[in-house]
Amino acid sequence: MDDFTGLLARDFGLKPQGKSAPMASQSNSSAADFNTFASSYSFATAAGKKSDSLPVFDDPGRDGDDLLFKDVFSGPPPPKYGSSSGDSRSPSAPAFDYDAMFKEPKSKSASSMPVYDKPVYDDEDVFESIPELKIPSTSSQSARFENVFSSISSSPTKHRKQNSSPFDDLMGNNLGKKGADSDREEKGSSIFDDLIPGFGRTSSPPSKRTTSETTNQSEKAPYRTAETSSNVEEDPFVVLEESESTPREPSRTDPLDDIGKFNSRKTDHSSVHGGVFVDIDPLDNLGKPGPDMNSKGKSHLRPPGNISGSQSPPVESPGSYHSKKVSFEDFLEPHNMSTPPPTNSNGSFESSDDVWLTVSEIPLFTQPTSAPPPTRPPPPRPTRPIKKKVNEPSIPTSAYHSHVPSSGRASVNSPTASQMDELDDFSIGRNQTAANGYPDPSSGEDSDVFSTAAASAAAMKDAMDKAEAKFRHAKERREKENLKASRSREGDHTENYDSRERELREKQVRLDRERAEREAEMEKAQEREKEEREREQKRIERERERLVARQAVERATREARERAATEAHAKVQRAAVGKATDARERAERAAVQRAHAEARERAAAGARDKAAKAAAEAREKAEKAAAEAKERANAEAREKETRVRAERAAVERAAAEARGRAAAQAKAKQQQENTNDLDSFFSSISRPNSAPRQRTNPLDPFQDSWNKGGSFESSRESLRVPPGQPENLRKTSSVTNIVDDLSSIFGASASQSGGFQDVDGETEERRRARLERHQRTQERAAKALAEKNERDLQVQREQVEKDRIGVTLDVEIKRWGAGKEGNLRALLSTLQYVLWPECGWQPVSLTDLITAASVKKVYRKATLCIHPDKVQQKGANLQQKYIAEKVFDMLKEAWNKFNSEELF
């Protein structure tokens, strides 16, 4: 059942003892909220505790020992009316009075001040079920559990009398512990300070003094008169100057112990009379009693005889209200005093600069939570600049506002312990040690409550910081005024004040030094934490960068893989398409080749048939032609022989007739010239030699004509004289011819008839010119005759060679052309088989000769390659010339047939 304590208490209303408690009423929303918080942390009540008030959230029929549901702000018992027993309640008391929440009840026997109404709350401790937090009670009439802010409106003496901690119900045994109450009473300190320093303090506890100092104070008691009225309101921010003006004794090492003892500071002046902000406390009107109560239940006016060094604060004289408000600079002045300074108690208040705070400006965040406390402390408070007088030494005060408590903190009775430091220690949630030296018990529920209280304290601290900044200016001004007033009324207390001032300053310097060290440590820790956070941030950034880089690499790899896959897919597709195309092309080529092969086979078969037929026909024709040629040759030979014989006979007859005519003419002429002069006779003889001759005839003109292959008629025509000659030339020529003929007949030498003859009477120049012309003529004639003879011999030799080569080449050419007569495509496609390699012919496939245009183009190329003239120009031999002539003749014949059969 121990594990289900909170569960049963929260869900079923059962306490750990097994009793059933009725659920709280839900009519009030505020009460329901507090009941929810109280029910989640249900603890057992302490034995022997009696509640004088009827709790709002508990069963009215149950006594104080059986309370189960507590409010976290467990209020004090309601005020007693009419009797000291406190059994009756005011019928007009509200169920949840916020104004009375921050007030502290006063019993009739302890105070003569009017009693204020209190809200009806459960007065049991929230944490009472924890054994370590059970605190024995010293008075049955005092409230066991009071309001969490009861110290705001209650006096320390009241707490000392009741021996109850204001925060027992909030923080348990650790913060509201009463184990050292006797020691605190002996030291004259308040049992516990308020949660917010300065709230609810009506009197300052006395400082720890010797008997002599107490005696001096008693002797100087007449200086003090009656205190201010009992309803004087206290300044809640007096701690701002008290924490600076009071010395501190580092007797406690537990920083959280200070939080539960906020009213344990010892000062020389009352919080009502010594605070700077005495007239601007926004919470003073919340029902706080005016008069200060000591531990003996005395009235606010304390006579000198009742002053003790352990309990009573120094008696204040009239007019000491401003005298105790000493600024922080005054505490640092180096002068000694043996007696405390007089205080002002004239009861006057400065209302010209009143600044009021409302409850809404101090939010309280105390909602229940199960979250762990914060892992890091709140941000440090900003240091406040401290004004320094002209003559006071420079003391380091930068560490005054520290958030890290040290082991040398002031004890409960130390008047110099800063209440703001206690609040700081409480806000950061540090572990503290109880007054008896034992550590506080820790559990999950304590951590939750502790975190909520820390959050509330932090919120209040923030509000106090804002108010402190708002009131700093007024504080400094009033400090100066109060200092002047206090110094004017110091009188005989100068020595005691100087000694106490020196002591306070020394302690303050020591505490400031310690605080500076703590701040330095705190700064170092913060720097280390900051460095760790920066390193962690850098590490996280590096990891993020690595993650981003890895993601980028993965994305790039994925994209590369996708691109590679796409490229591979495209390549495969292209390969497939290429293969399909190649296959289709191969199929087409194969089909074309098959068609061509079939065409070639058909063409070859047809060509073979045609070739066979043509060969047979050719053989027949050749045989016929050979027979006819032979017959014609025989006939021609016979005719030629007959013609030669006839020509010879005619020549002989003509020669005989010519000789006879020449002889007859010679005789007749001789007879006629006998009568002429001899000169004329010789001149007529020599004239033909000088006359131009048409041709040079050989000895036998008929024989010469025959040798040249000419006929008899051509020789006769050559002897004729052109018709355009004059008559005398004709006669001369005839005479010359006759003479030549006679000379040739009679064996005259050709040199005499063809040689150069001198002419009488011609000049030397003409003779030389005629001689040169005669020589050139002879040379040209001889050269032309030699060339003609050479050509004739060459033609004869070539013809003989052709006849010899034709015997072998004709067979090859006929074999090549067999079956291809008239088929130009077949001849052109097989032309490389008959031509010689040096001709430059490139073989042509039959598939390239399908169209007529391609056939014509290839034929033109073949013509340029094997034309006889082209072949002779290239310097071909006789065999190549013969082949070219034969092939060209066959191609030309086939071309003529191709043109006649096909259209372009």
Swiss-Prot record:
Ranges annotated as biased composition (Acidic residues): 232-244
Coiled-coil ranges from the UniProt annotation: 456-663, 762-804
SUPFAM superfamilies: Chaperone J-domain
Region (Disordered) location: 46-99, 150-731, 749-776
Compositionally biased intervals (Polar residues): 394-419, 674-697
Alphabetic keyword roster: Cell membrane, Chaperone, Coiled coil, Cytoplasmic vesicle, Endoplasmic reticulum, Golgi apparatus, Membrane
Topological type in the membrane: Peripheral membrane protein
Start-end of Pro residues biased regions: 370-383
Domain of life (superkingdom): Eukaryota
One Gene Ontology term from the biological process aspect of the record: clathrin-dependent endocytosis
GO cellular component terms listed in the entry, alphabetical order: cell plate; cytoplasmic vesicle; cytosol; endoplasmic reticulum; Golgi apparatus; plasma membrane
Keyword Coiled coil attributed: yes
Subcellular location: Cell membrane; Golgi apparatus, trans-Golgi network; Endoplasmic reticulum; Cytoplasmic vesicle
All residue ranges annotated as the R domain in the record: 619-640
Skewed-composition ranges (Low complexity): 81-95, 201-215, 661-673
Sequence ranges assigned to domain J in this UniProt record: 839-904
Record bears the keyword Endoplasmic reticulum: yes
Compositionally biased region (Basic and acidic residues): 59-69, 178-188, 245-271, 462-570, 581-660, 764-776
Complex and partners: Interacts with SH3P1.
Protein role: Promotes uncoating of clathrin-coated vesicles. May interact directly with clathrin.
Protein name: Auxilin-related protein 1
